[in-house]
């Protein structure tokens, strides 16, 4: 049996195919608008945490990381791995970014900016509490009453972390058995990393949670 394709049937078929293409392209465009551009394989990811009391702007190479308010952070921006010049405020530092790695560029209230590596968190069932201790003393993150260790002793200039169940919790930093500062309550969400950046020295330390901006999650 043979089928004859009439001009009218052929026109309908082409019109249907064209319509489906338009729908597919529209859906793709909608996804791009919703999720933003997809980072190419081998990209590096960088954000800024501004630990100072003044707004700063930052660039890494030719990538603008936007204006960042005091004690706030930008979202991650991606770029090819490699060697770059990072400018934050009036200071410029060389940085080396490895492919498929995440980093936070910290603007300190005094001293040069610091590039801190942020290993990605991939457990969708738990929350991650990470302490980036940029202070000059070892610190332990505990529950506010001091009874339970959440992240045990993190060395000065070191990093410590722990996966926990999603919860809203009040915490504090301890130097041994001595409380050195309360930490703002934080709501820990499933699949999310909450990073506590501790800057300063001596008795003047500043603990601030750094999380991705709500509008970009």
From Swiss-Prot:
Compartments where located: Periplasm
Pfam families noted in UniProt: AlgF
UniProt record, GO biological process: alginic acid biosynthetic process
Any one GO CC term of the record: periplasmic space
Classification via InterPro entries: AlgF
Signal peptide, first to last residue: 1-29
Presence of the UniProt keyword Signal in the record: yes
Keyword check for Disulfide bond: no
Pathway: Glycan biosynthesis; alginate biosynthesis
Keywords: Alginate biosynthesis, Periplasm, Signal
Family: Belongs to the AlgF family.
Function in brief: Together with AlgI and AlgJ, forms an inner membrane complex which probably interacts with the alginate polymerization-transport complex and adds acetyl groups at the O-2 and O-3 positions of mannuronate residues. Acetylation of alginate is important for the architecture of biofilms and increases the ability of alginate to act as a defense barrier.
Protein name: Alginate biosynthesis protein AlgF
Organism: Pseudomonas fluorescens
């Amino acid at each position: 049996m043979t089928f004859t394709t009439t001009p009218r049937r052929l026109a309908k078929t082409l019109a249907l195919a064209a319509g489906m293409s338009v729908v597919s392209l529209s859906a793709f465009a909608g996804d791009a608008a919703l999720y933003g551009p997809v980072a190419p394989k081998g990209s590096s990811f960088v954000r800024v945490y501004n630990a100072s009391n003044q707004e700063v702007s930052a660039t890494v190479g030719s990538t603008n990381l936007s204006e960042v308010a005091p004690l706030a952070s930008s979202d991650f921006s991606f770029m090819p791995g490699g060697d770059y010049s990072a400018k934050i405020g009036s200071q410029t530092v060389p940085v080396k970014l490895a492919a498929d790695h995440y980093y936070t560029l910290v603007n300190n209230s005094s001293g040069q900016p610091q590039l801190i590596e942020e290993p990605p968190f991939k457990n969708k069932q738990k929350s991650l509490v990470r302490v980036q201790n940029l202070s000059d003393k070892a610190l332990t993150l505990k529950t506010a009453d001091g009874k339970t260790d959440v992240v045990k002793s993190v060395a000065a200039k070191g990093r410590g972390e722990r996966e926990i169940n999603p919860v809203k919790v009040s915490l504090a930093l301890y130097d041994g058995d001595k409380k050195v500062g309360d930490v703002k309550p934080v709501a820990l969400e499933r699949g999310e990393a909450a990073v506590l950046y501790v800057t300063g020295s001596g008795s003047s330390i500043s603990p601030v949670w750094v999380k991705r901006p709500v509008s970009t999650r």
